[in-house]
């Protein structure tokens, strides 16, 4: 009893000292329910959102859950790792919305410009971004790893030379990265062929480089780890080789062993022109991407496959004009979130986001854009990445700006010609919780991807003509 009482007293003190960042609240009761669960009661207001944060060292707090106040006292059960209840600290706060950036870092490669496509929040607390440096066709894959404070840990480039060839080759593409126990796997292309590159976690040095000629100009876009190795998706027979986002090819899926050797594959061309993302849910594979419809416009495409790649079902989403699907993530309950941008039912390109259940049945869809209030005829809002959030909603990133020489407008400190990072947070039922834009002191920014960090915040991959890293705190 004395140990539990002391822990409850310590939690109470921590709350009083550290809750000043949001609306102050007080933990009034604390109880260990079981070795892996605690119960916290705190002062609250009905209907107000509160974040319950936990820490092992009083330095780094992460969001454990978000609850709505039920009156002047709210009680919540919180899961904690078994064996850590004696050395676990808690605090309660109201969310700070929209969040103010903690830091921004920018790093480049050997090329004049560098463009990131994917960002990963790593198990060690750091972040890893991949993309290319240079301009097509003479690009090299670039990977940059930072620690949790934004300090550079390593930077590596990969090309045809990484395979042992004498030249760098062309059309080297870094499309995404996957973390496994002992390494990172980069999915992309080397010298016009699909590539899987296994790199050392500590240095980024390539340990294995596997290239597969799957047909014409081809590439892997994304990978997922399975019991038998890896499954990669991408495209073959690209018609637009100068486009790193949609190459107008044929969707493709490949099975790789743990060493990256291809053991099988199948075309997805009947369902997807380009397979862009893959995720695993139980024993099934969920694949998203872009598909041509009967009117020769693009729609969101979604597939559920068995573990052997056989088709379970396919879904199409979109309207009368182009709908470009680039981001996908799965919630803890198997819910599927898709994002991209659309011209269907909009004045110009706007973000297009939807939530589906695990059977691919639409739960809600939202179109949103022009957050700075310019003439919508000239504004592009282009979304590239989405992440499911613990509350059952999602957060996405985009770029917002205009590309028209005939139009330029200034509203306050915002200029339409200057692109900015655009972030949108939706709740479980699709309600807008907050949105924000983030701008450079000079030049353009655009959000390319994002990941949820271990402290409950977000890291955003920013196109700033280099690899930009924008860190937002817990939201």
Model feature map: region roles:
Residues 1-7:
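Positively charged n-region of N-terminal signal peptides that target proteins for export
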Residues 8-19:
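Bacterial N-terminal signal peptides
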Residues 9-10, 23-33, 123, 390, ...:
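Compositionally biased, low-hydrophobicity segments enriched in charged and small polar residues
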Residues 20-98:
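Short, composition-biased motifs enriched in small/polar/acidic residues
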Residues 98-475:
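A sequence-level/structural motif corresponding to short, flexible coil/turn segments enriched
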């Amino acid at each position: 009893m004395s140990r539990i009482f002391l822990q409850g007293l310590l939690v109470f003190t921590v709350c009083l000292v550290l809750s000043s960042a949001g609306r102050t609240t007080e933990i009034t009761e604390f109880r260990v329910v079981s070795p892996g669960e605690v119960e916290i009661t705190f002062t609250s207001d009905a209907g107000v959102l509160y974040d319950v944060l936990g820490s092992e060292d009083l330095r780094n707090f992460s969001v454990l859950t978000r609850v709505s106040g039920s009156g002047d006292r709210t009680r919540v059960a919180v899961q904690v790792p078994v064996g850590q209840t004696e050395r676990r600290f808690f605090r309660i706060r109201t969310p700070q919305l929209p969040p103010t950036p903690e830091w921004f870092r920018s790093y480049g490669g050997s090329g004049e410009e560098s463009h990131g496509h994917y960002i990963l929040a790593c198990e060690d607390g750091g972040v890893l971004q991949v993309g290319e440096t240079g301009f097509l066709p003479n690009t090299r894959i670039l990977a940059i790893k930072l620690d949790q404070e934004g300090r550079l840990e390593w930077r590596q480039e990969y090309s045809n030379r990484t395979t042992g060839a004498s030249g760098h080759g062309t059309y080297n593409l870094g499309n995404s990265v996957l973390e496994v126990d002992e390494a990172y796997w980069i999915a992309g292309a080397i010298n016009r062929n699909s590539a899987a590159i296994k790199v050392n976690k500590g240095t980024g040095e390539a340990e294995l480089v596997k290239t597969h000629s799957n047909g014409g100009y081809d590439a892997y876009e994304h990978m997922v780890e399975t019991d038998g190795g890896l499954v990669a998706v991408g495209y073959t027979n690209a018609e637009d080789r100068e486009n790193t986002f949609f190459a107008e090819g044929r969707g493709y899926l490949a099975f790789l062993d743990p060493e990256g050797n291809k053991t099988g594959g199948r075309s997805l061309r009947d369902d997807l022109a380009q397979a862009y993302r893959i995720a695993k849910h139980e024993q099934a594979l969920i694949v998203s991407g872009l598909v041509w419809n009967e009117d020769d416009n693009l729609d969101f495409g979604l597939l559920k496959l068995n573990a052997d790649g056989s088709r379970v079902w396919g879904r199409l989403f979109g309207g009368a004009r182009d709908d470009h699907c680039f981001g996908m993530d799965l919630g803890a309950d198997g819910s599927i979130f898709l994002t991209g941008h659309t011209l269907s039912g909009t004045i110009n390109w706007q973000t297009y986001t939807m939530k589906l259940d695990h059977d691919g049945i639409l739960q809600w869809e939202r179109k949103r854009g022009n957050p700075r209030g310019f003439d919508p005829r000239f504004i592009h809002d282009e979304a590239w990445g989405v992440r499911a959030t613990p509350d059952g909603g999602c957060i996405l990133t985009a770029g917002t700006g205009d590309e028209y020489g005939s139009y330029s407008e200034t509203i306050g400190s915002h200029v339409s010609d200057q692109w900015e990072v655009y972030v949108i947070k939706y709740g479980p039922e699709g309600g807008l919780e907050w949105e924000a834009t983030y701008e450079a002191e000079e030049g353009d920014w655009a959000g390319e991807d994002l990941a949820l960090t271990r402290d409950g915040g977000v890291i955003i991959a920013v196109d700033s003509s280099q690899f930009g890293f924008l860190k937002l705190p817990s939201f």
